Amino acid sequence: NWENDGYDVKNFKGSVIRNSNHYFKESISWSKISSNTIAFRYKPFGHIFDVAGTSIFGDHNILIYLLGLNNSKVISTLLKILSPTMNYEVGQISSIPVIMANNDTKKIIKELVERNIEIEKEDWDSFETSWNFTTHPLIEYKEAYGYGSDLNDWSYKIKDAYESWKLNCDKKFKLLKNNEEELNRIFIDIYGLNKEIIPKVDDKDITIRKADRLREVKSLISYTVGCMFGRYSLDEDGLIYAGGEFDESRYKKFKADSDNIIPITDEAYFDDDIVQRFKQFIEVSFGKETLNENLDFIAETLGKKGTETSEETIRRYFVNDFFNDHCKIYQKRPIYWLLDSGKKNGFKALIYMHRYNENLIPKARLDYLHRVQTTYEKLLSDVNYKLTTDLSMVDKKDAQKRQADLNAKLQEIKEYDEKIAHIANQRISIDLDDGVKVNY
């Protein structure tokens, strides 16, 4: 936190500030220790460096030239000789011999390197963990195909959007690879190493990602949840809400959840649970005409089982896997928090950390947990009555299984109610400035 000229950092006990005159300057950085080929990264204005990622500073044109050179096979080959242990200190990097090209070649190098930076940035910004994320690629690329007679009410297929996105990713992948190989050729020629080094780059060494159907569908689901909570909006690009005053007028096409609590149930008990909201989002985003086909595409991607409907597959994903995937994406610092009663899935609900307030847990308990409990009690009463009637062996066995499941859920939810009541009564508040890890 460098607010107020780094006041908190400078006054933190044991804090050591080094080279602060270089803070926020344009630079190239690299990791001191690498298990693979060293990689040099471009950092535009506005970043602070640390000792784990050492930096090079200078004029923009020089930095761009050095970025192209240092990421070439010429320098990676030299560094294997200079530092066979793959420990890259300033000494090894500063000992790299730099041969400057003529002006015409410098211009070519600059164009190739800056285009590569642009491609890498576009790739990174397509993921919601980027500060510059605008919208999900499958939303952006849906415009490639449309269905319907009314241009104002077209429907779109997620499958088509994915194929369009995939073509775009493949094109950028090939362009980046070609550019890197051309840079290798240029620097190999400058250093006179044509007989020692070949310019070819393996696909595994290209750092942008190709399209992946499962990853893109899961990230679309994550983006959808973000829209449910108001983190994102279909009306505006980028991050819409991460604290401060919540403005409901910024969510016209798809309304953000009003109370910041979205229940996750293993069956369709309510019309406002996460699966129903998800279906609404897909319909609003891609159209009514293609809704079922789009749900099928999503379910098949997630691994639809035998007799499952597409909705059941999507529900299973939300119940069992969504939160785990979310924690992986955000490196165990989730911004969506899960209220979870336990292994029986008696009660689950998501809340958005940035909209949390001290009344949220009491509301979740009274308006949602107790509603789920009442639903289970009614269902159990129906099953108990059914078991008093004349049933076939198969139907009786199914009813007994249902009875046991509901009893287990009720027991779990009652125990959870006691625990969450203790938290609710404390009316705990959080400070967003403390960060996700502390608050979670």
Regions inferred by a protein language model and the residue ranges of each:
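Terminal accessory regions of large proteins
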Residues: 130, 137, 143-157, 167-178, ...
